[in-house]
């Protein structure tokens, strides 16, 4: 007898409502937005991952709770549950938080999505990939090391590279310009839609929809 059949039989015998096992459905996802904790980093380019998750939680009228290795919020969409993780480990140790929560939630790698900034993309450009290299991003590099694989999805949000030689660090932890800040809500909306599509229509179709050039004026800079 299959496990689900046995559950239904026991539910009837015990006169209890039948429950669906979340682990069996595969409808749970971990969305890790990368950034650095602290008010001084809140509006910096390197915190684009945090900004996306904050926007999603706010739109869903939910709040983050401080848990081990990070802040966690839960949002739902069409029967899917998304655990939004903002690691408290600082960027370079993001893998500790992602590995812990993947194990705790017992999720397969295909149900992990990481959102981060990318210097190699123009500001506002968004790219989703099912797998790939770290691209020089220290947060992705640590996640790759902790998970011992590159077979997990990531969404890169372009922050541009408008800095002089040797100025990379100051640029990524520098505040967004006024024009960039004005564009952030639209960027967050597109990323959130992309993640929802990832869970409903699959990664390939989600990538085709998300990985398009922004329309005129969409980047805001």
Name these PLM-found stretches.
Residues 2-131, 141-155, 162-167, 174, ...:
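Nucleotide and nucleotide-moiety/phosphate-recognizing core
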